[in-house]
């Protein structure tokens, strides 16, 4: 599913091509590109969920949290997001690329990926997609885009 998401993002969204194709044509194009039907459906559902996240007040309690609040991960999140990825999320919060609200959107979207081995590169793509879909996050998106295309994130181990 991650491959389909990256393909869609690079082909349509990131390249500023207007996405006016209907879902059936899009599915046909993705099938012709070699993606499996199940992965296509999951990716399209994932994108719908992402769009829905910004329309709801599901993170209203997060918007009220202070900048000194510390995120405690559930066991399921710990199992799905390794230490390196969690550290990267914290790093992005510290340099103000992510807010508490966008961090929660990223975590929510990562947990729906149904992947056992989320790589740091996959996480970066998810973050980029989330920031692209949240109004007012253009600067954070640009910073994240730079981090995605450079291998050194400035993190120390």
UniProtKB/Swiss-Prot annotation:
<protein>
    <recommendedName>
        <fullName>Protein Smg homolog</fullName>
    </recommendedName>
</protein>
<comment type="similarity">
    <text>Belongs to the Smg family.</text>
</comment>
<dbReference type="Pfam" id="PF04361">
    <property type="entry name" value="DUF494"/>
</dbReference>
<dbReference type="InterPro" id="IPR007456">
    <property type="entry name" value="Smg"/>
</dbReference>
